[in-house]
Amino acid sequence: MSDDFELDTDDLKRRMDGAMANLKTEFASLRTGRASGSMLEPIQVEAYGQMTPINQIGTVNVPEPRMVTINVWDKSMVGKVEKAIRESGLGINPQLNGTIIMLPIPELNEERRRELTKVAGQYAEHARVAIRNVRRDGMDQIKKAKADGISEDDQKFWEAEVQELTDKMIKVVDAALETKQAEIMQV
C-alpha cells in the first residue's frame, strides 16, 4: 500500500487565498461614506458589444474625500456609464460635466451603516463557507488516501495541517470583517 501520501497544501492555501481575494473585492464594493475608485469596480457598462468595467472606459479619480470623478474617453459612452452607475444600487447620483462624470458621495445615515455591516457579514460568511469547502476537499483527499493505505499517524498529521490552515484563514476573514465594519460605522 501507499505510505508516501503527500497532500498538496499549497493548492488548498491557494484556493483559500482565492476566497479571501474575492472577499476583499466584495468589501471594496461596499460604500463606506468615503470616496474610493474601487467602489466602482463591480459596475459593468455595455460598451462596444460587451460588458466592460468602468476603469476601461475612462479614468477614475478621487480628487476629494467625498468625490469620485470619471473622465470618460469616448463621448458616446458618457450616458451609458451614467446609467450603469445609477442602476448599480450604490445610491450615488452622477452629475455630468461634458465627458467628466462627478460622483458626490453622500454621508451614510445610521440605518444604512447598519445595513452595510450586515452585508459585510454576509460576504464574510460566504468566504468562510468557501474556505470550509476547501477544507472538506482536503479532508476527502486524506480519507481517500487512508482507504489507499496511509498510516493513521499520517492521516492525523494531514488532518491537523488542513485544520490549522483553515483556522488561520478563518481568523483572517474575521479580522477583515472587523476592520470593514469599523470603517463602515466610522462617522
UniProtKB/Swiss-Prot annotation:
Gene Ontology CC, one term: cytosol
GO molecular function: ribosomal large subunit binding
A Gene Ontology BP annotation from the UniProt entry: cytoplasmic translational termination
InterPro entries assigned: Ribosome_recyc_fac, Ribosome_recyc_fac_dom, RRF_sf
Keyword Cytoplasm among record annotations: yes
SUPFAM superfamilies reported for this sequence: Ribosome recycling factor, RRF (SSF55194)
One Pfam family it belongs to: RRF
Subcellular location: Cytoplasm
Keyword Coiled coil: no
Chief location of this protein within or outside the cell: cytoplasm
UniProt keyword list: Cytoplasm, Protein biosynthesis
Function: Responsible for the release of ribosomes from messenger RNA at the termination of protein biosynthesis. May increase the efficiency of translation by recycling ribosomes from one round of translation to another.
Family listed: Belongs to the RRF family.
Protein name per its UniProtKB record: Ribosome-recycling factor
Native source species: Ruegeria pomeroyi (strain ATCC 700808 / DSM 15171 / DSS-3) (Silicibacter pomeroyi)
Annotated gene: frr
